[in-house]
Design a protein with these regions (language model features):
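Short, flexible, surface-exposed loop segments at domain boundaries
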Residues: 1-30, 45-85
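Beta-loop motif signature
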Residues: 41-43
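A short macromolecule-binding patch
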Residues: 27-39
Length: 85
């Protein structure tokens, strides 16, 4: 399975669909939507598991995700691991 990493700040959270958008700096061309399946690992700053519901706007995160993205605006992909920085 090919993977990639993205680091950014959480810009928007869709709790109903378990997804969030990140942005790097103030550059809207970096906006990416990550879909977070139930089996994805979400880790706090200490490396301990946390719930999707604990993610908050403005958190800086590193996301390990699929190396493909949709051609939509914003691009979308599946997150395998979310780590709060």
């Amino acid at each position: 399975m090919m993977e990639d990493m993205t680091t950014g700040r959480i810009w928007n959270i869709d709790r109903n669909n378990r997804s969030f958008d990140t942005i790097t700096g103030q550059n809207f061309s970096t906006l990416t939507r990550f879909h977070v399946p139930e089996e994805a690992r979400i880790l706090n700053r200490m490396g301990r598991p946390m719930d999707f519901s604990d993610l908050m706007l403005g958190m800086r995160v590193q996301v390990r995700h699929a190396n493909f993205m949709t051609a939509s605006i914003p691009p979308q992909t599946t997150a395998y691991e979310v780590r709060v920085l």
